[in-house]
Amino acid sequence: MLLPQVRVPQPGLLHSRPHTTALHLQSIRDNKPHKPYIKHYVDTYHCLPLWVASRCLTFGTMSAFFDYQKQSVKTKTCVAMARALGVGTVRQRQLEFAYHTLPDFRNICAHDERLYCAKVGKNNDRGFAEMLRALGTVTTAERLSEYAKAVDGMLGALASGSSNLESKVLAGMGVARSDVTSLIIS
């Protein structure tokens, strides 16, 4: 069974994203990066499955790509995501929230900026708590637990040095320590 084919929006039909997203998707479709696995699927099956195309997409492009899909593809994506994560459902709004929140946090991490007090989104209204919520949508409970353990360990190190510093960091994060520890699977 092939997954949905890549649907590349026409540059003139784009709304809030720059047309470079469409050009990037078109270059993948047209195999401009000359990836052998893309050529194989296009030559053999005359389509490019989404899971193959996703290997060439940046997180931000993948977010825009999801936005451009037909409702039926978005629904199938949510069902596939829920199945892959072993959860009952992933709602489209949750996935859209994750896709619009996580690329900015990924970029913050990639550029060695401060994650704990970062704010992203159009109104700079999404902080660490929203990042945790978005991660909970797109990753397994076990992986989220590993991340929460690492964060809790760092908070513990701060607390042992200065409880005042820990409280300032938690305030900057916009979470209580219990918000982090509640994600840890025993």
How would you name each of these model-derived features?
Residues M1-S186:
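Amphipathic alpha-helical interface elements
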